[in-house]
Amino acid sequence: MAEQTEPAVITPAMLEEEEQLEAAGLEKERKMLEEAQKSWDRESTEIRYRRLQHLLEKSNIYSKFLLTKMEQQQLEEQKKKEKLEKKKRSLKLTEGKSLVDGNGEKPVMKKKRGREDESYNISEVMSKEEILSVAKKHKDNEDESSSTTSLCVEDIQKNKDSNSMIKDRLSQTVRQNSKFFFDPVRKCNGQPVPFQQPKHFTGGVMRWYQVEGMEWLRMLWENGINGILADEMGLGKTVQCIATIALMIQRGVPGPFLVCGPLSTLPNWMAEFKRFTPEIPTLLYHGTREDRRKLVKNIHKRQGTLQIHPVVVTSFEIAMRDQNALQHCYWKYLIVDEGHRIKNMKCRLIRELKRFNADNKLLLTGTPLQNNLSELWSLLNFLLPDVFDDLKSFESWFDITSLSETAEDIIAKEREQNVLHMLHQILTPFLLRRLKSDVALEVPPKREVVVYAPLCNKQEIFYTAIVNRTIANMFGSCEKETVELSPTGRPKRRSRKSINYSELDQFPSELEKLISQIQPEVNRERTVVEGNIPIESEVNLKLRNIMMLLRKCCNHPYMIEYPIDPVTQEFKIDEELVTNSGKFLILDRMLPELKKRGHKVLVFSQMTSMLDILMDYCHLRNFIFSRLDGSMSYSEREKNIYSFNTDPDVFLFLVSTRAGGLGINLTAADTVIIYDSDWNPQSDLQAQDRCHRIGQTKPVVVYRLVTANTIDQKIVERAAAKRKLEKLIIHKNHFKGGQSGLSQSKNFLDAKELMELLKSRDYEREVKGSREKVISDEDLELLLDRSDLIDQMKASRPIKGKTGIFKILENSEDSSAECLF
């Protein structure tokens, strides 16, 4: 009997139907995901709007509170000044009589003591109903955070307008309070003293903008608010802080006070306190552990003629090491110098400093914004954790850190959201920044010129070989190093390789024996690849860092291969030292002419080995020079700095950028040459400010040497992109603390102003030169001319100068120089 075939359970029609249903399901799921994404985007936008509004309102409360307090104080100050005017007129009428004591401070002190007992409360500024309504509003917003109801943009606009109006009045009050008014009795070195200058500040006369900065710090201190003093480097932030501490002592605050900063800045703090406020006791908290244990006891003792606790000056490292001892002190004022050191929220320094008990905190930094917005938020969170408490929200709203965005994209975003205007409004009560251009009468003008140099033939050969990773073949094949493996199969670290320290003996013969044993291994592990022609040249290739090799090639090919004289076996120093480097060709045209015109020059480089080659060039051209780098002792640094500042024959100062960027004064120079640029633009700016600062009497010109179309140019462009962020956030007209600057905060940044900021450059022209003469005499004259800066300094008013960028390009076909304007 034949078997009957049963019909298939799963038919082709069923399979087709299943596929159609699956496709329909996937399509439906895709649409659901799209809708969910859109819904999430809408909700997240609303949440960010609420958070932004909350931040604006909190900033608004601070501003309104400060404004009311300052207006009250302004009335009292006005009455005091009127009394002082009457006293001045009385002194003129009764010249032979003394109505006050020798210092003329009795009426002032009496008035200030009366004011000291007054108490302020936020209820004087905002009614209870207003505060409760704000709190209720935030509670309602949190309850509705999951809803999709749109938040009215007009509410935020209203808050911004309110903030603008309050901050405008606040800035006017700051400027009015610090209006220059000389004391009719007090004098310092025969010069009249500003009325606001504290009586214990006796070592000099404060400048008008320093008085204004002190008034701003006083306003923050009296109202229990922390802040950031971010004046440009070289404007005297230290003096303003010392004056503020002197003012606090005059008001009856006994201390102690704490100044915390990098080790290199401590001598300057101690010297400035001794110079300007000799009566105020200071304590350098440093030394061995035993020394510091003894010094802790002195913090709690009242000292000196004023019988107050000392101003304690210490370094970041000691503050972290002795946190247990220092955290138990109740500091009246904590000053963190070079505050950008705490830009990383996860670093140990910021964690330890947050534990310090301080009534008020102040950050000093000339570079409040270096790389990204989170660094600025880190500083603000350290000072005001209640206001700046959400980094993600802060970054999500002010997301302009994308360095790839074009100027047009940023302008379109600003037109739509006004995020920059909002950020300026929020930062206003807590940040004060003035530039040298704001105090142009005090500091001579400065111009920065970027000079593009070509690659010479040898540089081109090396550069191409480095990019192709064939550079080692040019100096002979190198034996591959045998890699020693650990028991787990991983390469052993060099630091883990065994060393028998018991073999070390005090006898010279044993030491020589040990050296002879380890020398072969040291030679095998050298990262320097020695070529087959050691008699003719010294080759230095660190093959593990290609980018550094490219930078060295741009600086000078001798950093990779330095020729050696076969007879003397010393480095070969001749004209090829100049002709083998595009930057040296530029220097060789500029430096002799600068010397002839009587200028003194600072040359900054990132690499000490580059300074060595520059020294060889100085010997070749018989230039008298000084040098400063991180390997030099303190006494050597002081000797070389003194020699450069006082000896007219010393023409050049060769300085490593990081070692010479902080804490030194080189105002004898009026020309700066940045031989190679830093990835961080603020490092180069700090280097420039060694000579462009208070005390400089001549215009300053900064020449930045850049090798065209190489990694050198990429570094400069990347640094310029970082400065673009600073231009937008720390706007030069929005944080001056005065009416002329901060009153502009009520206006939005228009598209034209943004475009000027984003596209602002230092160049207006290009110069093409032949290889035989990299710069023509005419172009060299244009490059070195600073007559317009001298006219600007004499006129004491801004004059649009000949700012420019000189792009030196090879033109092998046409030897004639062509100027394109």
From Swiss-Prot:
Gene3D superfamilies xref list: P-loop containing nucleotide triphosphate hydrolases, Tandem AAA-ATPase domain
Coiled-coil residue windows: 14-96
Region (Disordered): 78-120
Taxonomic classification: Eukaryota, Metazoa, Chordata, Craniata, Vertebrata
Intracellular or extracellular location(s): Nucleus
Modified residues (Phosphoserine): S486, S498
Compositional bias annotation for Basic and acidic residues: 103-118
Biological role stated in the UniProt entry: Plays an essential role in normal development and survival. Involved in regulation of the expansion or survival of lymphoid cells. Required for de novo or maintenance DNA methylation. May control silencing of the imprinted CDKN1C gene through DNA methylation. May play a role in formation and organization of heterochromatin, implying a functional role in the regulation of transcription and mitosis.
InterPro entries in the record: Helicase_ATP-bd, Helicase_C-like, HELLS_N, P-loop_NTPase, SNF2-like_sf, SNF2/RAD54-like_C, SNF2_N
Similarity-based family: Belongs to the SNF2/RAD54 helicase family.
One of the GO BP terms on file: heterochromatin formation
Segments forming domain Helicase ATP-binding: 218-386
Keyword Nucleotide-binding: yes
GO MF annotation terms: ATP binding; chromatin binding; helicase activity; hydrolase activity
Pfam families for the chain: Helicase_C, SNF2-rel_dom
Protein residues bound to ATP: D231, E232, M233, G234, L235, G236, K237, T238
Name used for this protein in its record: Lymphocyte-specific helicase
Free-text tissue specificity from the UniProt record: Highly expressed in thymus, bone marrow, and testis. Not detected in heart, brain, liver, kidney, skeletal muscle, spleen, peripheral blood lymphocytes, small intestine, colon, prostate or ovary.
E.C. designation(s): 3.6.4.-
Domain Helicase C-terminal: residue ranges: 586-736
Motif DEAH box, residue range(s) on this chain: 337-340
Induction: By concanavalin or lipopolysaccharide in unactivated splenocytes.
GO annotations of cellular component type: chromosome, centromeric region; nucleus; pericentric heterochromatin
Keywords in alphabetical order: ATP-binding, Cell cycle, Cell division, Coiled coil, Developmental protein, Helicase, Hydrolase, Mitosis, Nucleotide-binding, Nucleus, Phosphoprotein, Transcription, Transcription regulation
